[in-house]
């Protein structure tokens, strides 16, 4: 999760988020280079008088400032399109989790197993202990196995919501009457935090998302416990 005064992105917990961080750094490097070149040219124009009465045209410079931006855009667009394809790709899922947004809590249904469904509410501040995070911890976490392809089916029961886990690079709009799906793989154990990312009413800020990533054996034991 994010930490106090953190200026960077959250640590990735999925291959997609790793690729998003790489693309962010790649695009930022190009932007910084453009900023340096443009800043140098502006400063040079201020402190130098480049005046040539005999210069009537500059076809080469016009050609250069037409081709150079096109090449730069290609260097940005190619990895971006590749990443969009990877994010939209759905592998054969081992576990399917249906997520339903409500005002103002989440419901989870494990469609592959019988009788495994529950609601997830934010824990009020007066019921928290010192190990919990304000406005982020919930009473029932969604438990998922790591190193396993997971499909999330997202919908809403009332208004627009958005199911978002930044450390997984996952954001899916929850629309009433419509099913959206995303696929991801969690590559490490831990507790992952997120929040609704769509303005959905007065208590929009109070419907956090908590995913607990555990081993496959631990997940099977949890499913057996939930079915008892």
Curated annotation (Swiss-Prot):
Molecular function via GO: copper ion binding; cytochrome-c oxidase activity
CDD domains: CcO_II_C (cd13912)
Subcellular location: Mitochondrion inner membrane
E.C. numbers: 7.1.1.9
Membrane topology, from the record: Multi-pass membrane protein
SUPFAM superfamilies: Cupredoxins, Cytochrome c oxidase subunit II-like, transmembrane region
Mitochondrial intermembrane face of the membrane: 1-26, 83-228
Binding site for Cu cation A1: 161, 196, 200, 207
Annotated transmembrane regions: 27-48, 63-82
Enzyme class: translocase
InterPro entries the UniProt entry points to: CcO_II, CcO_II-like_C, CcO_II_C, Copper_CuA, Cupredoxin, Cyt_c_oxidase_su2, Cyt_c_oxidase_su2_TM_dom, Cyt_c_oxidase_su2_TM_sf
Cofactors that this protein relies on: Cu cation
Coiled-coil parts of chain: none
Reaction(s) catalysed (UniProt annotation): 4 Fe(II)-[cytochrome c] + O2 + 8 H(+)(in) = 4 Fe(III)-[cytochrome c] + 2 H2O + 4 H(+)(out)
Residues annotated to bind Mg(2+): 198
Binding site for Cu cation A2: 196, 198, 200, 204
Subunit structure: Component of the cytochrome c oxidase (complex IV, CIV), a multisubunit enzyme composed of a catalytic core of 3 subunits and several supernumerary subunits. The complex exists as a monomer or a dimer and forms supercomplexes (SCs) in the inner mitochondrial membrane with ubiquinol-cytochrome c oxidoreductase (cytochrome b-c1 complex, complex III, CIII).
Function (record text): Component of the cytochrome c oxidase, the last enzyme in the mitochondrial electron transport chain which drives oxidative phosphorylation. The respiratory chain contains 3 multisubunit complexes succinate dehydrogenase (complex II, CII), ubiquinol-cytochrome c oxidoreductase (cytochrome b-c1 complex, complex III, CIII) and cytochrome c oxidase (complex IV, CIV), that cooperate to transfer electrons derived from NADH and succinate to molecular oxygen, creating an electrochemical gradient over the inner membrane that drives transmembrane transport and the ATP synthase.
Annotated protein name in UniProt: Cytochrome c oxidase subunit 2
């Amino acid at each position: 999760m994010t930490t106090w005064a953190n200026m960077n992105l959250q640590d990735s917990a999925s291959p997609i988020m790793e690729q998003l961080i790489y693309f962010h750094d790649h695009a930022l490097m190009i932007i910084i280079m453009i900023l340096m070149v443009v800043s140098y040219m502006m400063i040079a124009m201020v402190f130098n008088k480049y005046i040539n009465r005999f210069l009537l045209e500059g076809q080469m410079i016009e050609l250069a400032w037409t081709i150079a931006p096109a090449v730069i855009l290609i260097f940005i667009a190619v990895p971006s399109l590749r990443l969009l394809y990877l994010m939209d790709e759905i592998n054969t899922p081992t576990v399917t989790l249906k997520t339903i947004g409500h005002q103002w809590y989440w419901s989870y249904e494990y469609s592959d197993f019988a009788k495994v469904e529950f609601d997830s509410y934010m824990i009020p501040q007066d019921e928290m202990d010192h190990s919990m995070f304000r406005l982020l911890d919930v009473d029932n976490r969604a438990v998922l196995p790591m190193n396993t392809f997971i499909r999330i089916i997202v919908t809403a029961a009332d208004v627009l919501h958005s199911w978002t886990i930044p450390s997984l690079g996952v954001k899916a709009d929850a629309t009433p009457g419509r099913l959206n799906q995303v696929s991801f793989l969690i590559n490490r154990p831990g507790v992952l935090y997120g929040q609704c990312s769509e303005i959905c009413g007065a208590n929009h800020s109070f419907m956090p998302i908590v995913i607990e990533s555990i081993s496959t054996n631990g997940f099977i034991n949890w499913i057996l416990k939930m079915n008892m």
